[in-house]
Design a protein with these regions (language model features):
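Phosphate-ester processing/binding pockets and catalytic centers
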Residues: 1-221
Length: 221
């Protein structure tokens, strides 16, 4: 709980699923999921407890990365996440990459498009009750790519009309980022493999979704 006079910070942890290969060898879809919380210690602690439980049972799956975890580990992670309904909200943005114009066929361009959409959603949906916003992205971009990404996204972030900070931090090193990983993967599976079960298993968490090319009519590849 935030005390009187304390800064109310909204934390946004973002991860992606899919790749940036815009050929027939690449994925058909790309997804980012953002986990919103003003109590990141609570959500991280829940997964930290699970991590130590797994360690005690001699498991070697101590990083929660949905594509790499066993089915049993995924089930346990999902169960823990479902219990965080009072602590987190999630917003996922997805695209059928075939509708992406050639000008978007790069990691910076694609992530910039998604980042701007995410910033607009934060401003409208959840940013008003906080004094500042901290966004934590996975470290998928290199140094120069991050500079280009920030240049593209900053105008949308300034529309928040409150202080903001953007950090790049490996998901494998942050438990809240690993929650975002699970949602991104679940949405991706529902689109790419027509497998709704992982997403259905996360029922109970407030989770909105947005198709960034919902008005698209032209397939470019």
């Amino acid at each position: 709980m935030t005390g009187v006079g304390e800064v109310r910070t909204l934390y946004v942890f973002v991860d992606e699923s899919g790749n940036f290969d815009f050929t027939n060898k690449g994925t058909d879809h790309f997804v980012i999921s953002a986990v919103f919380t003003d109590d990141p210690c609570r959500s991280a602690a829940a997964l930290q407890t699970l991590k130590y439980d797994l360690l005690a049972s001699r498991s070697d799956q101590l990083e929660f990365h949905a594509t790499e975890n066993s089915r049993g580990t995924r089930a346990r992670v999902t169960q823990v996440i479902r219990e965080l309904s009072q602590c987190i909200r999630v917003h996922s943005i997805y695209a059928d990459k075939h509708y992406a114009h050639r000008s978007l066929h790069s990691p910076v361009a694609m992530l910039s498009l998604f980042g701007k959409a995410l910033a607009r959603w934060v401003a409208v949906a959840v940013g008003g009750n906080h004094d500042q916003v901290v966004l934590v992205f996975d470290s998928v971009l290199t140094g120069k790519q991050r500079d280009a990404f920030m240049k593209a996204v900053k105008p949308a972030l300034k529309a928040l009309e409150k202080p903001f900070h953007v950090a790049f931090h490996p998901v494998k090193s942050d438990l809240n980022g690993q929650i975002a990983d699970y949602f991104a993967w679940s949405v991706f599976r529902s689109l790419e493999a027509k497998d709704p079960l992982p997403l259905e298993a996360l029922v109970g968490i407030s989770h909105s979704k947005f198709n960034i090319f919902e008005r698209g009519h032209t397939r470019y590849w």
